[in-house]
């Protein structure tokens, strides 16, 4: 089967004592398939928001490679970003707005990553969705908006999102592994002749 690699190859060190060994790159979800290779030891693999691998999870034998389905990619263009205070604390959360006429592909508990060209101070990585507007006119806005548990830590100092700058919110995931012994787990998103999308 032909594979078209997407993004970078990442590596985890696997061992028998920790099922919480996770990828540190918090991978952007760009295809519906993840190719994994176990080197030095077999491993159980878990994929998710903050996964923990156990012996109940998918197993790949030492020296073998497999392609695991990730499900459909979820991403949406962002047209507005604001911060809101959390009552009784010094913290804030982030509200992102999507274009009118579109909806949110994200649900409560999803991990998301925001990328903004030319305004990278708005960027954040692998933060959790804690609220999704369901009204057709939430607080006077006709855009669908979601609330994300992301605190920039700088109050309201950022310059507003520039309309001509591209901003995208995309789902992200982490990989965890529990090895039969000390080894390496290599993984990379791929597009394949079977129809992986991105």
Language-model-detected regions and their locations in the chain:
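Beta-sandwich interaction modules
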Residues: 21-26, 63-72, 170-174
């Amino acid at each position: 089967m032909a594979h078209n690699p997407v993004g970078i190859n990442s590596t985890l060190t696997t061992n028998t004592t920790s099922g919480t060994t996770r990828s540190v790159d918090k991978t952007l979800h760009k295809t519906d398939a993840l190719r994994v290779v176990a080197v030095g030891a077999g491993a159980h693999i878990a994929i998710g928001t903050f996964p923990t691998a156990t012996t109940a999870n998918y197993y790949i034998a030492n020296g073998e490679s497999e392609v695991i389905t990730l499900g459909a990619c979820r991403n949406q263009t962002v047209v507005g970003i604001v911060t809101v205070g959390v009552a009784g604390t010094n913290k804030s959360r982030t509200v992102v707005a999507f274009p009118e006429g579109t909806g949110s592909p994200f649900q409560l508990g999803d991990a998301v990553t925001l990328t903004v060209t030319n305004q990278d101070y708005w960027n954040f990585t692998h933060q959790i969705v804690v609220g999704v507007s369901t009204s057709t006119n939430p607080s006077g806005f006709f855009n669908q908006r979601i609330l994300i548990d992301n605190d920039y830590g700088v109050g309201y100092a950022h310059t507003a999102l520039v309309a001509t700058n591209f901003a995208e919110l995309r789902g992200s995931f982490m990989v965890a592994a529990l090895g039969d012994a000390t080894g390496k787990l290599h993984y990379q998103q791929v597009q394949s002749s079977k129809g992986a999308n991105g």
